[in-house]
């Protein structure tokens, strides 16, 4: 659902919308970016289009522009922080418009220590919550925290999110750490650009 049909709509100018979001988050003004998102919603863009399509494309573009030296690491970090703040600000609106299932699965999403790509995991956590799951997102953790969590909770799935090829050894070690504590009773899945 790209357009909210209950609102007066303007023609969706996909590339223009993306450029406006990109520009506002890179200008380090959260207030301007928040106003832009509200305006896009007022003009009929659905929150699903914005959070599920626009934000991931903008995040990828920011990463590409860092790799190609069009933006500095600091500029990308600040822009992604703005994007993540927008994501958390508008997530309640996103979740309010979706019907949750009757299944109340409990899922743990782990972003391995050292992984610097977190936007995908945050987006996946939002999507899973919208489906009625109880989703725990674990970032920048200590092994003791992770161990206490997996031993203290009944989990239906553990997801590992990674976007870096250099994380293979850490992911294997994390998987071994998890299975040595929970056995094979809880499935472990890997997702992200690495896959």
Locate the predicted segments by residue.
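Short helix-loop-beta junction
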Residues: 122-137
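Long amphipathic alpha-helical segments
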Residues: 1-95
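Accessory recognition modules or surfaces
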Residues: 87-105, 147
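Short phosphate-binding/catalytic loops that engage adenosine nucleotides
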Residues: 45, 132-134, 183
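Conserved hydrophobic helix-helix packing surfaces used for dimerization/oligomerization
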Residues: 105-108, 158
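A general structural motif
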Residues: 113, 117-118, 137-144, 169-170
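Cofactor-cradling patches in redox/metallo enzymes
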Residues: 142-195
